[in-house]
């Protein structure tokens, strides 16, 4: 059984369910786009990039395991629109350290700290520190360690602890369980729980970028992030990532950011050519999905947004 719907919350979702044997609950995989905005752009209330993956069966409302991939602006609000408390997340995975993929993380962790300080820590899975040849380092570790610094420095953490001593003294960072890995061309398992396994590969966008695959008995999904081809610009056979294509062989669902030709360097779109070329083009993603045999392609991180011909203000 497969069912698709667009919820009132402006969240697109795909539902996959396996056929159960008699007297068994049907395992299911639910993939939800919690935000589809590309870059630090504000337009029509569209939330920042993020994907929620839920796995379970009929008896658990497909919610035994709940995983969030990236957390752009408004993620916690979008989760609330599908009746998911941030304290219920098992893990969050980051594809890379760009603010349009991480803006909502501080909000998510502050809310979890406020209401769930006595609950389990949240697994935060991401690349190890990734030095750039340009002389700086992309650091998910620093993001996690310092996620509550503004709240601590403003005095909010101390004030809220004075009202409820169950809250952790170190603020939201104490609720994060950091799991880092060194991305490689070959897939490696970076997280697992029960029947759910998450693998990762290196992919090209910025230093430390990774793409993920979730495998469950109900189906599989690849989260490409902002991956593009290793060659930074044409001529090249495709704009898509060879590593992501290998990771996605036989997958059920591909979730991937996309660049539409309308914002290409030959248009007056405001999109810098290097930014356009470091991501995957819409038509190339469709061709890749066909090559790997994917059943569904969910386009996200849309540049430009539907109905727009420019990127940004």
What are these regions (language model features)?
Residues 11, 59, 88, 268-269:
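General secondary-structure edge motif
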Residues 207, 218-220, 228-313:
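Cap/insert and terminal regions of metallo-dependent hydrolase folds
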Residues 24-221, 311-313:
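Binuclear metal-dependent hydrolase catalytic cores
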Residues 15-18, 231-233:
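Intrinsically disordered and other compositionally biased segments
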Residues 1-4:
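Positively charged n-region of N-terminal signal peptides that target proteins for export
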Residues 71-72, 225-229:
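Switch II (G3) loop of P-loop NTPases
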Residues 7-17:
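Bacterial N-terminal signal peptides
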């Amino acid at each position: 059984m497969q069912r698709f719907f667009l919820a009132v919350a402006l969240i697109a979702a795909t539902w996959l369910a396996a056929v159960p044997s008699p007297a068994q609950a049907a395992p299911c995989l639910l993939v939800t786009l919690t935000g589809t905005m590309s870059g630090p752009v504000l337009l029509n209330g569209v939330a920042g990039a993020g994907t929620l993956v839920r796995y379970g069966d009929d008896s658990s409302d497909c919610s035994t395991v709940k995983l969030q991939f990236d957390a752009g602006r408004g993620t916690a609000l979008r989760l609330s629109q599908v009746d998911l408390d941030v304290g219920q997340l098992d893990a969050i995975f980051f594809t890379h350290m760009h603010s349009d993929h991480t803006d909502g993380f501080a909000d998510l962790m502050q809310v979890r700290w406020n209401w769930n300080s006595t609950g389990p820590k949240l697994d935060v899975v991401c690349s190890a520190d990734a030095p750039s040849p340009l002389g700086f380092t992309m650091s998910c570790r620093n993001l996690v360690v310092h996620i509550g610094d503004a709240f601590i420095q403003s005095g909010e953490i101390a004030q809220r602890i004075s009202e409820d001593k169950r809250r952790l003294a170190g603020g939201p960072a104490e609720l994060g369980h950091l799991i880092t890995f060194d991305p490689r061309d070959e897939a490696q398992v970076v997280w697992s729980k029960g029947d759910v396994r998450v693998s990762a590969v290196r992919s090209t966008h910025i230093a430390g970028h990774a793409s993920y695959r979730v495998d469950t008995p109900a189906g599989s999904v690849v989260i490409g992030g902002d991956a593009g081809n290793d060659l930074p610009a044409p001529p090249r056979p495709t704009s898509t990532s060879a590593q992501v294509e290998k990771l996605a062989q036989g997958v059920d669902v591909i979730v991937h950011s996309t660049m539409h030709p309308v914002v290409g360097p030959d248009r007056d779109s405001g999109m810098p050519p290097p930014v356009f070329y470091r991501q995957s083009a819409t038509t190339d993603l469709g061709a890749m999905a066909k090559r790997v045999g994917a059943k569904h392609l969910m386009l996200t991180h849309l540049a430009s947004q539907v109905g727009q011909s420019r990127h940004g203000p």
